[in-house]
């Protein structure tokens, strides 16, 4: 859920941790879609009357919407808050350096944990698309490609671990005297 995740991320960056949030288009917002869209459209109407180019700026990409939500939870006009915001990176989809990294979820922000099964919710990706984000289709195709690659990579990893286990089993009898010595000195546990 958008707000809960943003609150946890805001705390983490204030504590000095670097945080990267990927697949922002998959974030959920509680409340039905139509209500959330009306809220966002009301936000779009807020502008400087004499010169709208001076702000407030309305970001359309899910990653930027999330980034702005986090910014609202930080003292972003102070040096400390600015430094915290620089420690946060947000992305739509999972771009190359992070597609091979281990990712984690925040259980306290999961929809299944926090919302009753009957409650309505909206997807940030769909909301963004309907208020002017142009890259929903591209992001979706790139995600499909990434998932295919990840599947292949995982299959390869599984075979490698299987082979290494087999190799360990094969040489177990020949290196047993060495392992006994290593265990004696506490190198192997």
From Swiss-Prot:
GO biological process terms on file: negative regulation of translation; translation
GO molecular function annotation: mRNA binding; structural constituent of ribosome
Protein's UniProt keywords contain Ribosomal protein: yes
One GO cellular component, as annotated: cytosolic large ribosomal subunit
Keywords: Ribonucleoprotein, Ribosomal protein
Annotated NCBIfam families: L13_A_E
Family named by the database record: Belongs to the universal ribosomal protein uL13 family.
Protein name: Large ribosomal subunit protein uL13
Organism from which the protein derives: Salmo trutta
Biological classification of the source: Eukaryota, Metazoa, Chordata, Craniata, Vertebrata
């Amino acid at each position: 859920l958008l707000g809960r995740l943003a609150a946890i991320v805001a705390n983490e960056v204030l504590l000095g941790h670097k945080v990267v949030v990927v697949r922002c288009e998959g974030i959920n917002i509680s409340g039905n879609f139509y209500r959330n869209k009306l809220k966002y459209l009301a936000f779009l109407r807020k502008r400087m009357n004499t010169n709208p180019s001076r702000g407030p700026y309305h970001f359309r990409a899910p990653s930027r919407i999330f980034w702005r939500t986090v910014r609202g939870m930080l003292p972003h006009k102070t040096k400390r808050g600015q430094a915290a915001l620089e420690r946060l990176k947000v992305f739509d989809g999972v771009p190359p350096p992070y597609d091979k990294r281990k990712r984690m979820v925040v259980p306290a922000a999961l929809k299944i944990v926090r919302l009753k099964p009957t409650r309505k919710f909206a997807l940030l990706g769909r909301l963004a698309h309907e208020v002017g984000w142009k890259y929903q289709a591209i992001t979706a195709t790139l995600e499909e490609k990434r998932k295919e690659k990840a599947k292949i990579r995982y299959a390869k990893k599984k075979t490698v671990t299987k082979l290494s286990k087999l190799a360990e089993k094969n040489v177990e009898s020949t290196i047993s005297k060495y392992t006994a010595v290593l265990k004696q000195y506490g190198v192997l546990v």
